[in-house]
Amino acid sequence: MRDEDCVRFLQWCLPPLGLRWAGYRRVRRTVCKRIERRRRELGLADAAAYRACLIADPGEWTRLDALCRISISRFYRDRAVFDRLVCDVLPNLATKAGRRADTALRCWSAGCASGEEPYSLAIAWRYALRADHPGLRFEIVASDDDPVLLARARAARYPAGSLKDLPRDWRAWAFERDGNVFHLRPALRRSVAFCRQDIRGEWPEGRFDLVLCRNLAFTYFAADRQRVVLQRLSERLRRGGILVIGGHEMLPDGDAGFRRLGSGLPVYRKSS
């Protein structure tokens, strides 16, 4: 598919899926390669024929929606953000939880892909923070709608490249190496509860102290759907809870109900 055909097709098909073209501009070739493979599977001649297929068969839109999912994941991705979480955000949340006499600090990793993000939190807590907060459980819920990615997350076996941003001493403590594959230690695997859910529909139960929703809703979703997600996130976060989004993302309609923490990082505190 030529680039101009790719652009034209995505600009046509993304809005009915509740997605926005601007979020896909940089990753369009990846998505269009998937669409091309699907077109060939169906024995269709070109993009126009696949477009006609979508018009004739509403069920094909579900398959197309899956082809438009983008997941780029590694441990400790955006190191400055994780450093802020470990050095400031999580200790403060843990202290507040202790003052409330809570027994658990709850975190949700939305769109967790193959598990690197929630496992990074688990490693950070157990290695650097847990000893300072005895008696406080760190509960991590991680959700994604891709069963293949979730299976990889539960297996917790990663190539060396996935760990390149993780502090070296943490890596040695958290993983067992088998050649070029790194196995996360069982206790850390058990510390994350994975579930198959689409953020556009079903969500985990309960309220959270920390939510990471990075490079997902506020990149790829249409503006009206972004507003719905943000409202629901606000309802699920405790007052004073923390929302982390992607480094190139912005909250829709400004930061209403949230206050951005300093240093220019995409870390927000719920203020109302």
Q: Locations of the language-model features?
A:
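Core SAM-dependent methyltransferase catalytic element
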Residues: P252-S272
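Conserved beta-strand signature within the Rossmann-like core of class I S-adenosyl-L-methionine
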Residues: R239-G247
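A short glycine-rich, Lys/Arg-flanked "PGG" loop and its adjoining helix->strand segment in the class I
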Residues: Q226-R239
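Conserved SAM-binding loop of SAM-dependent methyltransferases across substrates and taxa
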Residues: S114-D132
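Conserved AdoMet
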Residues: R2-W108
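Conserved class I S-adenosyl-L-methionine
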Residues: A101-S120, E139-V141
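Extended basic-aromatic, gly/pro-enriched interface segments that bind polyanionic ligands
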Residues: A110, A131-L212, L216-R225, M250-P252
